Amino acid sequence: MKKQDISENQAKNIFLGIGSNLGNRIINIEKAKSLLLESGIDFISVSNYYETPSWPDPKKPKFINIVLKVNCKQKPQEMINLCKLIEAKLGRRKSPKNSPRICDIDIIDFDGLVLKDKLCLPHARMHERNFVLFPLFEIEKEWVHPIKKVNIKKLIFSLPNKDIR
């Protein structure tokens, strides 16, 4: 496990995923980005938009997703709390797992930190998700999974479903 004092230093190499499959998906994502900026999160890189079928039910509305590389002063739990607050401000409500949503913000990787308590870092299923890996690759071509120690190119190559636009 990577040990560091995130409270004293600004964390680097934090990756967030933002997705939406309800309403005006791009506007929802842009509002989420604005709220992150207003909260003091500094953007280093922002991927293009990627559209994917809803998973696990492709009959539900398609998602649009992006990945951001950011700097922040928050600790991991503070960051996820901020993400959940922004989701709520945009209208996300508690709903069954994998339901359509206005906004979903996930911490993909927090500076290589590995946590398995209340907050799981890196994101537990990110290495299986085309809508995370493709935009992440766009902005960080040399990224390596902190647990699996596999680079992003190999993770993308191993994806069973590469259906993404």
Feature map (PLM): residue ranges:
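Nucleotide and nucleotide-moiety/phosphate-recognizing core
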Residues: K2-L16, L22-S95, D111-G112
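Flexible, gly/pro- and Lys/Arg-enriched active-site loops
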Residues: S45, S54-F63, Q74-N81, L85-R165
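Short glycine- and Lys/Arg-enriched binding-loop motifs that mark or flank ligand-binding interfaces
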Residues: N13-F15, G19, F131, H145
